[in-house]
């Protein structure tokens, strides 16, 4: 019995070669899912790193602006893909659409709404790929378990056909079946961990972008208040002259 076990190839590749076609398909599917997981990890990691570094630099530059026009001048060098520039454009577009309106509070509310929608849209865009990670992390263990159950069923069928409980006959089939579960866990565990890491990073990035949006809204609010004060100042001067 020991010689038969030694002659049986129990390496990972050997178990795969001797596995049933259904178990092979399960293993291949899980390996492809693992490849997708790591591809998403590397691509999104680079994207997060670049976007966060760029947004942090833009936020520092915009902190020096004292008006919306000055912020637009600073953002002119950010490039067309700049998220900060998009937020500034939202505020500027609302000012242009609301030209002639004396309701400054309404302008601020509409601008705030547009900025919130823009931040939410960026968050959804940054979260692309996380759905695949969640799906892989959730179903991979069960897919691997299906392969294990199928492989053990075939092992029992082999025992019935050979009418022997010799370990040399039973062990390879069971080992092949358990390999499917192992591959399922290898695919699922990194997917769940990476999903949670990205979820935290997306939340942090949205918070940083929200700070930029608040900075843009602050500049617009200051401009509107200063314009309103400048328009009201001549009236107060005229009233004083008449009283005198």
Please provide the spans of the model-predicted regions.
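Hydrophobic alpha-helical transmembrane segments and adjacent short intramembrane/lumenal linkers
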Residues: 163-164, 169-177
């Amino acid at each position: 019995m020991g010689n038969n076990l030694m002659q049986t190839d129990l390496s990972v590749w050997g178990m795969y070669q001797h596995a049933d076609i259904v178990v092979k398909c399960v293993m291949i599917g899980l390996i492809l899912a693992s490849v997708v997981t790591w591809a998403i990890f590397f691509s999104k990691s680079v994207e997060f790193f670049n976007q966060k570094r760029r947004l942090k630099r833009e936020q520092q530059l915009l902190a020096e602006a004292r008006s919306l026009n000055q912020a637009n001048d600073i953002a002119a060098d950010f490039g067309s893909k700049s998220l900060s520039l998009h937020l500034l454009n939202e505020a500027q577009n609302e000012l242009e659409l609301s030209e002639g309106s004396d309701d400054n509070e309404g302008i601020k509310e509409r601008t705030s709404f547009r900025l919130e929608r823009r931040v939410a849209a960026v968050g959804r865009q940054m979260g692309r790929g996380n759905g695949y990670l969640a799906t892989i992390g959730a179903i991979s263990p069960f897919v691997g378990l299906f392969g294990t159950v199928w492989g053990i069923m075939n092992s029992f069928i082999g025992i019935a056909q050979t009418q022997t409980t010799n370990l040399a006959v039973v062990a390879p089939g069971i080992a092949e079946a358990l390999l499917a579960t192992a591959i399922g866990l290898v695919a699922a565990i990194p997917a769940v961990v990476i999903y949670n890491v990205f979820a935290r990073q997306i939340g942090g990035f949205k918070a940083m972008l929200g700070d930029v949006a608040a900075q843009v809204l602050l500049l617009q609010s200051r401009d509107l208040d200063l314009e309103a004060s400048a328009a009201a100042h001549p009236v107060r001067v005229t009233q004083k002259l008449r009283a005198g």
